[in-house]
Amino acid sequence: MAQISLMRNLLILLFFGLLVLPLKGQTLKRLSSDADRNTVRDTTNTRNSVRPPKQEKQERPPIELYKIISVANDTTIVDTSLTIKKLYKYNYLRKDNFELLPFSNEGQTYNTLVHDFSGEEVRPIFGARARHFNYMEVEDIYYYNVPTPLTELYYKSVFSQGQNLDAFFTMNKSERFNFSIAYKGLRSLGKYQHILTSTGNFRFAFNYQSKNGRYDLKAHYVAQDLLNQENGGLTDQALTNFASDDSQFSDRARLSVNFEDAESILDGQRFYINQRYDLIPQNDSVNNNRIQVGHILNYEDKFFEYRQTSPATDLFGESFVTSNLTDRTDLNDFNNRIFVEYSNNLLGTLNFQVNHTYYKYGYNSVLIQDEGRIPNLLQGNLIAAGASYKKFYKGFQLKGEAQANVAGDFSGFDFDAEASYQLKDKAFFSGGIHINSSAANYNHLLYQSSYENYNWYNAEDYKNVKTSSIDFDMKSSKWLNASASFVNITDYAYFALDTDGFVNSFQTGDNVSYLKIKVNKDVHFGKFGLDNTVAYQTVSSGGSYLNVPEVVTRNTVYYTDHWFKKSLFVQTGLRFNYFTKYAMNAYDPVLAEFYVQNEQQIGEFPLLDLFFNMKVRQTRIFFIAEHVNSLVSPSNYYSAPGYPYRDFTLRFGLVWNFFL
């Protein structure tokens, strides 16, 4: 951990060194090309000194030139406005978390209120999913093209003794080469015993395009370490004390927890390179044909580790060790993809690709039990082949993509088809089908732990999880935003309690049918606004394996105005979140996974926030009073069984853009 801390400090020092150096050039100056002829003699000076001409300050380039490019080459521009959507994204994840319920401390996990089954992987993915909410994947890294250096600082206060800062810097070294460097760090002690969080996400990315435009390169390096102290939740007596609303327990540190000697860390590094080359020069706009060859390299090395000084045998069962328990799971994943893409104005775009993946998942030793032998590794090679098609025609867009494993120990395929239509400037409609078959996550197939009950090998017994869905989406600022998805899952893999009361992996042969409808509308009345988002969910079959709240809603009433001769923009109002009661998933710290429980119903507690936000130039300032109603409402709010939700808290922060 000392090495991680040292590396983190060095990276922060490097970043701020890069940040400070360009500050000397904030005022760009332009001198006359004929300086000698335009100098002016100062006749009042006995030394006949030469006074330089008055220097001109360059105007900042238009905001439209500051471009953000996704890995899929979708381009947006830097947005410094203060909207209600910006308020929703002002959180630790930097994205709208309407479908999630956070735990009490910043940087802990989230319980999922609204589910998403749109995954397109054809091979297993790493477990410890409860720790991956802030783990940045390939699609979370963006690339930039900016006319002048750009810096963004994000800050938000946390829950006692710490801070959350996300610092970002990008610049173009030339018209065709850009790099960016960023670091997001968090430390928060929390209000309850032993829930400190300490996380870091370092990103470095660059993109390049050759002078003739035929070669394009995107690449990034990401290093992430996400550490959480674990306490197992409140004890039974502490839960009673919490619900009693006794003032002596308003200091949450007085509430006893199940243990105070455990911590877990998710650590990962990734190297990513995405490059393509045009075989046919695009010098003539009449040229309708384009052939590109490309290569994508993605190497990731990650591990999850759970450490505990004294095993909590009363909660997790007997242990092979009596002290200093350490469970570590590693994954090395090395993927190479080569593709050929043909584009034609009449026919559309057709892509063929071949993937090779080397994977090595597991542990250092084999476990021999009375019930059998549990191996230490899942290791091998996978080869997959696929194709995709895309065509635009008079407002319509057709897209299709298919991929299947053709060699290796894991079978799997993915098929996605979508049609969309842009109705002038009124609305965008899309609909499609998605079919996927892939192995369950690695920690369902193989898991080893010092806790005797947390050892299993299911790779030979589990079938592929098969998911099929029909989706519809409409986006319209004039009407409303709406989406609907009907999902059917067979051979669904999940975690739940076994007959002995310990968490284990299960796979059901029953169908799980899930319907989700989500609607959003932002209505304006002069300077007032009302933004409503409602999600409806139901599980028509398989309700014992997938529990969801029937209704999740967020309603925000707000007022906006310009003050002080339009030098200050103000946004103030209240935000109301609510979800119906249901059998909420419970959290297991050993696995860092949520598991199904059907005994305790949680929900139907409102969450009311008050906010007063401001924008001055390129700075957005936020003042948020979170969960105000907890001051007068009963203590019946939980993020998971045994884990209370946040109490009333005042939060402050800002997002500041510098255009240097």
Q: Model features per residue range: what roles?
A:
Residues 22, 178, 349:
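Exposed beta-strand and adjacent loop surfaces of beta-rich binding modules
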